[in-house]
């Protein structure tokens, strides 16, 4: 099998050296070239035709976002962004994902060499995922048409959503058309700390419903979406007649925290047939067992189809496990989940 050919663009000579060490330490990939800025990278891309580009967000001569926008228009290819953990860094990274980057890694704030080498396996995994990702599914999405407001639903009704690679844009596409009459939504997207708040704030500006990073103990309200905070699990709990959110530092599940399975299992237990479960694009199997538990508890469950997924890993695993009632294109997810929750459709298996 041929190796994954990687080109790294970073203005830091140290970062270029570290990325080269990391990539070349894995037998299934090789660093074919490095560039100090996008202008040099442009020529190297033509020369080496890499499978994956790693791209620093902030660089002289042309910043990473400008370059990414031009690249995706003229020569689309899988890109993994390398970002700082600053507030500005998280906003720029989310913009990069919107423009077509597949994923991102964050630079440690201290001890760059030790920190990056500790991330070696994670970086390699993201490069492998990017090499296999569907670029056709990751072209910038148009703004979906707002759905008509439906009848006000019981506050017992809610929707649980799980996603990973490619999920930030898929979630935007699902939430943006939702009317204020929508039920509450609980969302777990695999993301490091420092990014989930920026992600929620960005969605809150774009959506009619309220979107926020979830907080421990807060009451779950219709017309609101709650995003699991980075590196914390989110569960649905009860407080008397109301739903509330539980945030905790339990061990990683399926190598993830937050984990989609943790959310889905709690929703199966607390909401049962009053819930709809949705699994979107992502690598791995997180959410498959939890979605089966939701279906067995009477919830209606949807999976995003392969054609519209950046990575058809998590939906495929959920389908194979038998936890999915219906497979739909991303463009139909919002409409279908609202139709099912409004109809109170549920099926026991």
From Swiss-Prot:
The molecular function terms of the Gene Ontology recorded here are:
phosphorelay response regulator activity; protein-glutamate methylesterase activity; protein-glutamine glutaminase activity
Enzyme category, top tier: hydrolase
Entry EC no(s):
3.1.1.61, 3.5.1.44
Query: What cellular-component terms does GO give this entry?
Result: cytoplasm
Q: Which domain of life is it from?
A: Bacteria
**SUPFAM superfamilies linked to this entry:** CheY-like, Methylesterase CheB, C-terminal domain
Looking at the record, the residues that make up the CheB-type methylesterase domain are 152-344
Post-translationally, this protein is described as follows, namely: Phosphorylated by CheA. Phosphorylation of the N-terminal regulatory domain activates the methylesterase activity.
SMART domains reported for this sequence: REC (SM00448)
Record remark: domains: Contains a C-terminal catalytic domain, and an N-terminal region which modulates catalytic activity.
Family membership? Belongs to the CheB family.
- PANTHER family, A to Z: PROTEIN-GLUTAMATE METHYLESTERASE/PROTEIN-GLUTAMINE GLUTAMINASE, PROTEIN-GLUTAMATE METHYLESTERASE_PROTEIN-GLUTAMINE GLUTAMINASE
What functional role does this protein have?
Involved in chemotaxis. Part of a chemotaxis signal transduction system that modulates chemotaxis in response to various stimuli. Catalyzes the demethylation of specific methylglutamate residues introduced into the chemoreceptors (methyl-accepting chemotaxis proteins or MCP) by CheR. Also mediates the irreversible deamidation of specific glutamine residues to glutamic acid.
Spell out the protein name for this chain. Protein-glutamate methylesterase/protein-glutamine glutaminase
């Amino acid at each position: 099998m041929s190796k994954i050919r990687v080109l790294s663009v970073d203005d830091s000579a140290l970062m270029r050296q570290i990325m080269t060490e990391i990539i070349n330490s894995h037998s299934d990939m090789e660093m074919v070239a490095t560039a100090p800025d996008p202008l040099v990278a442009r020529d190297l891309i033509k020369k080496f035709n890499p499978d994956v580009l790693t791209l620093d967000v902030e660089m002289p001569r042309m910043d990473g976002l400008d370059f990414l926008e031009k690249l995706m228009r003229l020569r689309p290819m899988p890109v993994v962004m390398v970002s700082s953990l600053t507030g500005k860094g998280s906003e720029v990274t989310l913009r990069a994902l919107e423009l077509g980057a597949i994923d991102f890694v964050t630079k440690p704030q201290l001890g760059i060499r030790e920190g990056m080498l500790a991330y070696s396996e994670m970086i390699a995994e993201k490069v492998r995922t990017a090499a296999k990702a569907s670029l056709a599914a990751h072209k910038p999405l148009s703004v979906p048409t707002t759905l008509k407001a439906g009848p006000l639903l019981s506050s017992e009704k809610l929707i649980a959503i799980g996603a990973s690679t490619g999920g930030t844009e898929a979630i935007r596409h699902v939430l943006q058309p939702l009317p204020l009459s929508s039920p509450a939504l609980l969302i777990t997207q695999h993301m490091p700390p420092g990014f989930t708040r920026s992600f929620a704030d960005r969605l809150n500006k774009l959506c009619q419903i309220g979107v926020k990073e979830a907080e421990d103990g807060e009451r779950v309200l219709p017309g609101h979406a709650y995003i699991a905070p980075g590196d914390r699990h989110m569960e649905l709990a009860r407080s008397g007649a109301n739903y509330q959110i539980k945030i905790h530092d339990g061990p990683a599940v399926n190598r993830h925290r937050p984990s989609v399975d943790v959310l889905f299992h709690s929703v199966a237990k607390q909401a049962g047939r009053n819930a709809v479960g949705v699994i979107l694009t992502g690598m791995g199997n997180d959410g498959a067992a939890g979605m089966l538990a939701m279906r067995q508890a009477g919830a209606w469950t949807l999976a995003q189809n392969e054609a519209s997924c950046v990575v058809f890993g998590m939906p495929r695993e959920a389908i194979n496990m038998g936890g999915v009632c219906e497979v739909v294109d991303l463009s139909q997810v919002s409409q279908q989940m609202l139709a099912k929750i409004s109809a109170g459709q549920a099926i026991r298996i």
